[in-house]
Swiss-Prot record:
PANTHER family: LEUCINE--TRNA LIGASE, MITOCHONDRIAL (PTHR43740:SF2), LEUCYL-TRNA SYNTHETASE (PTHR43740). The keyword Cell membrane does not apply. GO terms for molecular function: aminoacyl-tRNA deacylase activity; ATP binding; leucine-tRNA ligase activity. GO terms for biological process: leucyl-tRNA aminoacylation. It comes from the Bacteria. A motif ('HIGH' region) lies at residues 40-51. It catalyses: tRNA(Leu) + L-leucine + ATP = L-leucyl-tRNA(Leu) + AMP + diphosphate. A motif ('KMSKS' region) lies at residues 700-704. The keyword Ligase applies. This is Leucine--tRNA ligase. It comes from Porphyromonas gingivalis (strain ATCC 33277 / DSM 20709 / CIP 103683 / JCM 12257 / NCTC 11834 / 2561). Keywords: Aminoacyl-tRNA synthetase, ATP-binding, Cytoplasm, Ligase, Nucleotide-binding, Protein biosynthesis. Belongs to the class-I aminoacyl-tRNA synthetase family.
Amino acid sequence: MEYNFQEIEKRVQGQWRKDKVYRVAEDTSKKPFYVLDMFPYPSGAGLHVGHPLGYIASDIFSRYKRLRGFNVLHPMGYDAFGLPAEQYAIQTGQHPEKTTEENTARYREQLDKIGFSYDWEREIRTCDPNYYKWTQWAFLKMFDSYYCNQAQQARPISELIEVFARQGNEGLNVACGEGVRFTAEEWTAMSEKEQQEILMNYRLAYLGDTMVNWCPALGTVLANDEVKDGVSERGGHPVEQKKMRQWCLRVSAYAERLLHDLETLDWTESLKETQRNWIGRSEGAEMEFRLAGKDCTFTIFTTRADTIFGVTFMVLAPESELVEEVTTEEQRAAVETYLTETKRRTERERISDKRVSGVFSGSYAINPLTGKEIPIWISDYVLAGYGTGAIMAVPAHDTRDFAFARHFDLPIVQVVVPEGETATDPATWEDAKDSKSGIMVNSDFLNGLSVEDAIAQTKEYIREKHLGCVKVNYRLRDAIFSRQRYWGEPFPIYYKEGMPHALDEDRLPLRLPEVDKFLPTESGEPPLGRATGWHTAEGYPYELSTMPGFAGSSAYYLRYMDPQNDTALVSRSANEYWRHVDLYIGGTEHATGHLIYSRFWNKFLFDLGIVCEAEPFRKLVNQGMIQGRSNFVYRIKNTNTFVSYGLREQYEVTPLHVDVNIVSNDQLDIDRFRAWRPEYASAEFILEDGKYICGWAIEKMSKSMFNVVNPDDIIARYGADTLRLYEMFLGPLEQSKPWDTNGIDGVHRFLKKFWALYYNADGIRVTDTAPTKEELKSLHKLIKKVGQDIESFSFNTSIPAFMICVNELTAAKTTSRAILCPLLTVLSPFAPHITEWLWQELGVEGSIVTATWPEYNEEYLVESCVRYPVSFNGKVRFNIELPADMSKKDVEQAALTAPEAARWLEGKSPKKVIVVPGRIVNVVV
């Protein structure tokens, strides 16, 4: 019987579904292990061969852990809300729910074909009301909570209200926005609306004025990763910075815990460092500067208060509320022009772009230590969300300040002389001087002190003179949590007299209403403004914004633990059994988004006692990217003529991506190209040697680059087991690598050779013959190697090990059941279909999924013979095989008396013979 992968995979997958072999439940007799993939957004394009890379790796690990006796939770679902579905709905008029349903069905079909061991009874979709009920519930809990810095946990807002009634808010150590001080009497005298406005400064979910990436064409706020080069990633529409009132989550309250608990996680150091930098803890001082000629002060945060004598100008972020205050009439037109320009740039662009720009406000500040006036400038290299949105510029010791001072011809004063140097004229410098260590100069009472001593003395001086306070600051911002879009979770909020009120929990889920269009209303309201009856039974209007894409993905891992629970996000018993995700696999692009928000969300639920562990993901593995091999055609400018790759330098050409499916070995199928797109129907070609040769490049696999390879095509030609093995064979999991089918035939031939160990023309060839010592050695060597590889995620090195073992067993004409049954178990995590089929054909009871991983025996791994390379004067001339326990003297004698040795000795006696036991023999003649 030949290896018929189509029949095998169809039957095996049907059997798995029928027997529900991947269904999992809490089983206290088994140790739990939770393996999770970052769930996909179901796009209309479906999966390409790059998507399953991490899924295959996690599936191998899950299957291995089951074989090791663990109770494995390995679920899958869909991150189904989001902008792409909404944009498609706007373009086609189709409801996002319909297209999302079609897309998820397509994804499910593709995932099933690859043979993943998912428990589909636990499937979740973020757009399902039964799921987003718990996203809304968590939001309400945050709305009704504040953060106590002293207790380092979230507490009910009702407790804070009681404190306000007793003592006001003086001296409270809690997380809050900018707020006024008030006594208990003043609190009691406030109206309900005034009290609610005060509480908004303390709630963990709050309404606040914040700078956002606003896209007028899309009518919505965009996250930083949805904007590129000043335009929306989807559609290429202009994006501007705009201050808007938005729902926010007070993620910054958890900054210290998010930072500290990184040390408890088994993540790569590079990923931890990315989060540390994003959280951005810095110790420094807040100092007050007075505006010259005005009874007004403003605060700056600095980590280097000791350099205050080197301050020669101040800089405000363009979004700072102080800009209006400090701008003089003479400078107003210039300032307004500059503000308009900066609105077009996102924060990321401002951080990465080194171009110098700015405008003088016309006003001056007073240096609190020197009393000197210093000019106040406005520049987009200062960000409103970090510190106070205002900085004191020390150009001698900060690269961006230095560039700014040089560009606008502002003074530069050196205040730190690096160790081993002498003070020099800054006019001769090419860049700022390092100030991390050295001796203070030009700094009044700090002169002669080391930097370390100067920092301590300056902080003490600031405290004594009441010029400010010592403070720890974080770069981490609160998360903007509302979007002016349709396809997202509705907020469980209604408005009464303009103030937000929480919907009662028993009225959840608040379902997304129907609308006639998915665009903003004519008056500029979000799409939900089009909904009929979008208000409470009492007539109070609901919130019109929806939640962002990360809302549904922030706690989805918990819902998988208990997906059918109608009364809780997750029961205490289910959470205490599964506890956390033991292995999480996904891309590095989520390091500063999803992974921060999920950790925050989990810590909040931990504070409430909903979950039993403070961290959601114990071990995190980032898979690399499978890149596409793109092809290009070269169109001569202003023509419809295409020139072959080797002749392109003779013309002025524009390279264009072409569908890789109409290219073979870089040769274009001209007829298929003309049929590919209407504009190419009349295309002309300049060929080389009668062929049109395309250019190529290794790029991200993307529909827009026409380099997508559909896994369905690979499965149809080679089978799912070949695809699974080949994706692992391409290279280390964590590295990016190009997709190249040159090696896939070899992997497919391996499976045929593996099949031939079990089947021949007459049928099953497996017997009860006792295994030989060499067969046992081959098997146990493989068991050890593959087990170690899986534990270390070195899946790529397992594939050659399988090939070597099968070659050895084929050469030995192995038929022994004692060898071939365990071999099936070891290969089954990688190639589950062929191994399941053969397992059943051999009459073994149950599914191979529930088999037991074989233990290797060290006795079989001891080498009885050693192959020695024999060198003469350093060059290997021949090899000899000798017993492993042979003495050095006997090895030397065997090498010198071997028939091949005479040729290289030439009748001479060796000057020296070096024997490295078990390794090499070197003869010096």
